[in-house]
Amino acid sequence: MGELGALQSIVYHRGSLRLLDQRKLPLEVDYIDVKCSGDGWNAIRDMVVRGAPAIAIAAALALAVEVSGLEDFTGTPAEAAAFVSEKLEYLVSSRPTAVNLSDAATKLRSLVSRTAETEKDAKAIFQAYIDAAETMLVDDVSDNKAIGSHGAEFLKQKLEVSKDISVLTHCNTGSLATAGYGTALGVIRALHSGGILEKAFCTETRPFNQGSRLTAFELVHDKVPATLIADSAAAALMKSGCIQAVIVGADRIAANGDTANKIGTYNLAISAKHHGVQFYVAAPITSIDLSLPSGEQIVIEERSPNELLNSEGGLGKQVAASGISVWNPAFDVTPANLITAIITEKGVITKSDADETFNIKDFIQSAKLYSTMQ
């Protein structure tokens, strides 16, 4: 399902899954085989694959590959559903902050549970799961293109310009973080293809350097005019007047719009507010967690101290003094009051004029109602 490409993070054909080892980019392009949920868990935890949409799809497909090989399974449909549910719960534990993974697992668990109530053959449970996981892969690409289209058009209207828009992005939110095209980087791609992007700036995104290793790699590959900056140069860039907007992705968005994203996003939002630069979040609806009233309830993953103590995001030589303690959160939470709008595949979520807050629940309900009418 998809041809092998330099910027394709997930290469899947039924019964086979290969993941691009993003730790080795941009100097080496290497794919690893994933044959079971255990392989998928390790690939996600070790950041072979990363990006909230991509890890959800990689997890779902890892289990799809595993169950496709269970031809000798002799259990009941209920036992097959229980097997799938247990594996999904295990996969969710690989990276807890990104809601896409837990959301996908919840939907897939519900599917196999319902299927088990009507099917008499356990293999039908596995087949239903495989079909659903494959649909998620296809839908992600189309959703990302819709995010790009909505975002580019909204920025053009909001900034009241028809060309020469320059933006700053953080971390990696492109083809390498999704099944294809990207979220925040998808908006940048849409701006570029529409002939209205002057330049994209990307941060290096320490300590794992997703910006310098991955986003810069994608932008160069697509021949998008781009400049890499140090994380610490972002405020100076905004002060210079060289950019009109910041566009980032999201790992989890609370009901009020508070957004968890790669560490350093909060810094950018504060700087953007100070300098009068618009700040956008681009993410699929699956990144929104309406069960959380605010960002205070979002669990923040902490990564290995080695990512700071050693070069190359922990994979290289020691660069810090032995004995120093380390605090290395993978994400931070940007308050909704610092966010201009949230760009989704269903449209752009804006704030009400009355109280300058997001009403995300109503937006999602309206989007679902509209979809049922099509």
Curated annotation (Swiss-Prot):
Keywords: Amino-acid biosynthesis, Cytoplasm, Isomerase, Methionine biosynthesis, Nucleus. SUPFAM superfamilies: NagB/RpiA/CoA transferase-like. GO terms for biological process: L-methionine salvage from methylthioadenosine. The active site is at D251 (proton donor). Pathway: Amino-acid biosynthesis; L-methionine biosynthesis via salvage pathway; L-methionine from S-methyl-5-thio-alpha-D-ribose 1-phosphate: step 1/6. Pfam families: IF-2B. Catalyzes the interconversion of methylthioribose-1-phosphate (MTR-1-P) into methylthioribulose-1-phosphate (MTRu-1-P). This is Methylthioribose-1-phosphate isomerase. The lineage of its organism: Eukaryota, Viridiplantae, Streptophyta, Embryophyta, Tracheophyta.
